[in-house]
């Protein structure tokens, strides 16, 4: 199991060989100082994981997260910690996990005004075809919010997907928007 260190809202894998291993198993994390490596061999620095990625990898048994006191944070504790740091973590994590289990590569979508950028092949190999916004199925979305989501996805030439999470059934439904000129 790969050793990872919790540092605030990030998790670091200091060992470069272990970083390469984790990255090569699904494009997890970002190598510090290297943008969009095309090959795992390009990983020559420690890997930085988001909390969402870390919770997922801990659940899968691929990483062991250790806090500043040397305590190992198992999946449940790491999930609880992340919930305190990230707004709507439960909704975001449910969507992240669902997309990963469906075989997609899921990265942060913050620069696109979304929760996630989703790839079919991987970063550095293609541009992300989708941006995903995670929403509680019971949450109301105003027409103005919907239009603002659409503007960002349209200007970046990505398909907008709303991921609707039903907390009761823990299911996720997806709605993809296609914008047309009239």
Curated annotation (Swiss-Prot):
SUPFAM superfamilies: tRNA-intron endonuclease catalytic domain-like (SSF53032), tRNA-intron endonuclease N-terminal domain-like (SSF55267). GO terms for biological process: tRNA splicing, via endonucleolytic cleavage and ligation. CDD domains: tRNA-intron_lyase_C. One of its GO terms (cellular component) is cytoplasm. The active site is at residues 119, 127, 158. GO terms for molecular function: lyase activity; nucleic acid binding; tRNA-intron endonuclease activity. It holds the Pfam family tRNA_int_endo_N. This is tRNA-splicing endonuclease. It comes from Saccharolobus islandicus (strain L.S.2.15 / Lassen #1) (Sulfolobus islandicus).
């Amino acid at each position: 199991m790969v050793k990872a260190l919790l540092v605030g809202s990030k998790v670091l894998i200091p060992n470069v060989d272990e970083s390469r291993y984790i990255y090569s198993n699904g494009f997890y994390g970002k190598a510090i100082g290297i943008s969009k490596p095309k090959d795992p061999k390009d990983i020559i620095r420690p890997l930085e994981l988001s909390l969402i990625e870390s919770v997922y990898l801990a659940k899968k048994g691929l990483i062991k997260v250790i806090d500043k006191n040397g305590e190992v944070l198992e999946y449940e504790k790491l999930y609880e910690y992340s919930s305190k740091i990230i707004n709507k973590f439960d909704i975001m994590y449910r969507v992240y996990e669902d997309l990963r289990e469906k075989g997609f590569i899921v990265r942060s979508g913050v620069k696109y005004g979304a929760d996630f950028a989703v790839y079919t092949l991987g970063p550095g190999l293609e541009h992300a075809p989708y941006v995903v916004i995670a929403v509680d199925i019971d949450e109301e979305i105003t027409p103005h919010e919907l239009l603002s989501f659409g503007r960002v996805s349209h200007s970046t030439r990505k398909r907008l997907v709303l991921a609707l999470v039903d907390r009761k059934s823990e299911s996720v439904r997806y709605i993809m928007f296609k914008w047309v000129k009239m």
